[in-house]
Amino acid sequence: SIRLINFPRDIYIDYSEHVLSLLKKKSPKLYGAKGFQKINAAHTVGSRIEYEDNMGRFGDSNIDFLADIIEEVFMIRVDDYAYVNTKGFRSIVDLFGGVEINVPVRMKYDDPTQDLYIDLQPGLQTLNGEQSEWFVRFRQGYDKNGEFKNYSDEFRKENQNEFLKAFFKQHINLKNLGKVDELSKLIGENIRTSIIGVQKISEYINLLRKSLNKNYTQQSEIIECADSIIDGVYFNKIRSE
């Protein structure tokens, strides 16, 4: 089975006193910043405290720290990682001819500071690379009546999971194995990853072939959180029950 897990970016990380003291010493500005205990800031924390002196399993303080946080908090071992920039995301979607998906609401949002202009109509449609980026990033904007609405990060997370499920279902198949060379080029240009070297890449290709030759199921794992305000900052705190 393929399990898709989307970690809410505002998850609260309760760092140890050792990590906090290191951060206070090496990066007092970050230590004093509100929101540094969100999981989406963990890679920055790892870099600032020079976690494991860049000698961890990935040889990169920020990635090693985030991977160890995920393992400690969620008991999920990170064997490899792939960091995809937005250009790479768009290019990969276009390489496979887009993704057919149902857009649940009118998505209209303009943000000149990010050079982000989202404009999607609701309904079933095939999204190209740029439109797919709009779809997975949208969480607030104008509805069909022209009213501004905040749909929350939870709404965006659900859309991201649906997008990944649709991408896997539509494109992870034998007929697309011929795109491996083009995909490898895109990976080299746009993706930072631990999956390097002929042997490791071959292992993943063989794993892909095995999954294509058998029926497999897709599961979306939901991380149950509760909204919380700590020192005036919004967090998602993981439910313990």
What are these regions (language model features)?
Residues S1-E241:
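Non-catalytic, solvent-exposed segments at the cell envelope interface
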